Amino acid sequence: MRAIILVVLSFLVLSFLFGPAWSDDTMDCNYVSFGEYDYTDVSTNLPTRNNNPGNIRKTKVTYFGETTNESGFESFAAPEWGYAAMFDLLDRLYTGLTLSEAIYKWAPPVENDTEKYVRFVAKKTGYDRNEYKVNVNDESIIEFAKWMSVLEGMKGFSDDDVSFGYMVWDKCYSATVEMDDE
């Protein structure tokens, strides 16, 4: 409940500062960003430059807020779009998996220290690695995605970026968008 209140208050402040992203209770899924971001500095890491907190690889799926780049990873206009894509991917391909199963699928041991990743996310969220089930319709997913993005290398983001990403997912993806699985 506290998270919902925080998200609503943050949204109201940003709507006042940057103008509304919603009209008639519908989000404009073609807006660019709530804030102004410039992550073109090559000294920042790839997930941060690409506003891609989940370090999502390019596939045939087209995401809202997607931009073009030359790397093998998706890039987005702002962090909230990257988080929305992350929530979409978790929803479509990870729902019902335990925390451990989801992270082993997201970050396989071939490329990652997956066990360390699982322990980190479980510790930071307080979720049991074998009991917590991925469910994007439960706001506990916000903390899950936040700590995943930390291990994926996202820097300079805020809790608001994660929460806005969840709102973007809710308005632009959930139950409204039919997308092919990867």
Feature annotation, model-predicted:
Residues 1-4:
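Positively charged n-region of N-terminal signal peptides that target proteins for export
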Residues 8-16:
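Bacterial N-terminal signal peptides
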Residues 19-182:
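Cell-wall polysaccharide-cleaving catalytic domain and substrate-binding groove, primarily
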